[in-house]
């Protein structure tokens, strides 16, 4: 974000007040980004009425973007935020470090997530495997925070977790190397809304599983999956929202209409409340409709896998389905973003602005929990390495808990 020299700021403030002349255009170079933020907030911000008056913010328009935003947003607002517009290159890999020797400074990284189209995905790295070495060098306390920070290509030594327990009950843990993975350099890649899905059999139940990281009204994978699940006789669905952070309200409507009981179709899913300026261009409510080209699965219950990363519209989906069907949460507490947001991009300033614009309530007028939803069945995602398995594996920690719950 920008920095403004102190002396220059003093000169500008003096000139702004000189001769009663409007000199704002002359200083747009220094204030334009914050004026853009201000203009959006005064039109769309949920708490627009509580914003300081324009004349009270004269000095603040010359501040950094973050400083300006903290000055004008409502104190209860923990969601409105700024980010760089540029997509950042990535390996598409998440991991959790663990010390694997009590006597030596040896660590390994347990892979917890892999994006399919990423360098990690292309290298064939799977969730639940372990990174033991990078280019032949071990992971230690000294390099544990930097061993994959340079963004370059590397040759990873991959391992598998193994436990042995002797007759006296003493457990020994091994990470056994089994393959090399050529990890390409960080890059910008296309993310997939629904990266993993499958159909499982659990007792007399046909279970449809889908890892849904984002849903929009244009998420075609949801439509095709609904038809696949219907054709294969799926009568239970496990919806994995552990990594769902950036969905849309029309996507919520589509997914809810696929999952809900047929008796709920035509009923209100969600109601919106905007600021006092009202916005006729935005919908005031969303209705459960028979999805165009998709199948309604007519489910009485949906099992939702959650984590601390589950946020925003994903939480509204949980909340707005509850009046219509049984929603069983398994995993961890969700983040707790109880408002709807809009994202605005500005290429001139290289900024992406995520702005709270509405209160969302379910059909009974109930808002999502500001502190997040606590799970009905609390399960740690990674505490048992033997259950950190590829998504959709029946032995994976959260999915196995969901199957146990639906068959008990």
Report residues per predicted region.
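C-terminal, low-ordered peptide segments at domain boundaries
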Residues: 135-234
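Extracytoplasmic
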Residues: 88-92, 106-108, 126, 151-153, ...
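C-terminal "post-core" interaction segments
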Residues: 210, 217, 222-224, 229, ...
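Bacterial Sec-dependent N-terminal signal peptides
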Residues: 1-36, 44, 52
